[in-house]
């Protein structure tokens, strides 16, 4: 009996030590901060981000539509009320991810493995560059590893009137090719698109998709997701040890879908 009594504190000490180690391991998985790169989806969100002029130019005559159906049932002890809804969403009007078939470059969202939507994040402030395809390769050279999610902060400001076209900063074709060839896991921006009409692409090709949308082509032709219209990217500047998570609804043949991306800061 004395031996058992003597050993009991030893077992308790070992058990508590193991518990502390497990707690320590769990704590290393809990982020210090979680930053939401999404926004509240409203019926007019696409117009807020694109501006009506740009929506009309591309032939998008409507934004989002919320059809809420309220219902009530009497089960004998009072009315039970609630609602269901049909949500018609413009899938590129808000924080979203592009799939290859957005530019006729392959399959839809369902071809992406789930691993494509998560990865270590590197954020770059490119607000000092002028509008257009102006962000050069040197911004990323030797600062990005294969498998990283690369995000740029452009300081995008939505059009302030219906007749004002959106202006944006995006990558040069050389920079998009550099990142895509590493390859990065995904590319992201706060601007409404990586597409730009401010200047001519610095590439010669017979491929219409490459000539028209070279930045999209670099990534989507290699099945690398593109995230656009992200919010709160400025809150990520100067932070390190970040993990990006941005999985969309897995829509069959979907060319894109709205996302609520999260960044976990460790």
What are these model-derived regions, one by one?
Residues 11-12, 105:
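Repetitive helical segments and hydrophobic/amphipathic motifs
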Residues 19-266:
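Active-/binding-site microenvironments in catalytic and ligand-binding cores
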Residues 1-4:
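Positively charged n-region of N-terminal signal peptides that target proteins for export
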Residues 6-10:
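Sec-dependent N-terminal signal peptides
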Residues 14-17:
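C-terminal motif of bacterial Sec signal peptides marking the signal peptidase cleavage site
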């Amino acid at each position: 009996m004395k031996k058992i009594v003597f050993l009991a504190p030893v077992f308790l000490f070992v058990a508590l030590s193991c518990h502390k180690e497990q707690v320590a391991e769990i704590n290393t998985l809990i982020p210090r901060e979680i930053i939401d790169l999404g926004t509240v989806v409203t019926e007019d969100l696409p117009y807020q981000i694109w501006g009506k002029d740009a929506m009309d130019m591309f032939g998008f005559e409507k934004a989002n539509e919320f059809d809420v159906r309220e219902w009530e049932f009497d089960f004998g002890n009072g009315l039970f009320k609630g609602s269901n809804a049909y949500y018609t969403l413009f899938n590129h009007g808000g924080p979203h991810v592009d799939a290859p078939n957005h530019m006729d470059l392959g399959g839809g969202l369902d071809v992406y493995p789930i691993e494509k939507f998560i990865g270590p994040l590197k954020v770059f402030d490119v607000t000092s560059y002028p509008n257009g395809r102006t962000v050069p390769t040197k911004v990323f050279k030797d600062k990005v590893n294969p498998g990283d999610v690369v995000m740029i902060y452009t300081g995008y400001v939505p059009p302030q009137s219906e007749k004002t076209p959106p202006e944006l900063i995006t990558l040069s074709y050389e920079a998009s090719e550099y990142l895509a060839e590493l390859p990065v896991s995904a590319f992201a921006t706060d601007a409404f698109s990586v597409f730009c009409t401010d200047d001519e692409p610095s590439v010669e090709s017979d491929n219409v998709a490459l000539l028209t949308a070279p930045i999209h082509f670099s990534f989507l032709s290699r099945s690398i997701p593109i995230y656009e219209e992200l919010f709160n990217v400025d809150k990520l500047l100067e932070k390190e040890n970040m993990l990006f998570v941005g999985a969309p609804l897995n829509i069959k043949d979907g060319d894109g879908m709205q996302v609520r991306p999260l960044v976990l800061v460790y």
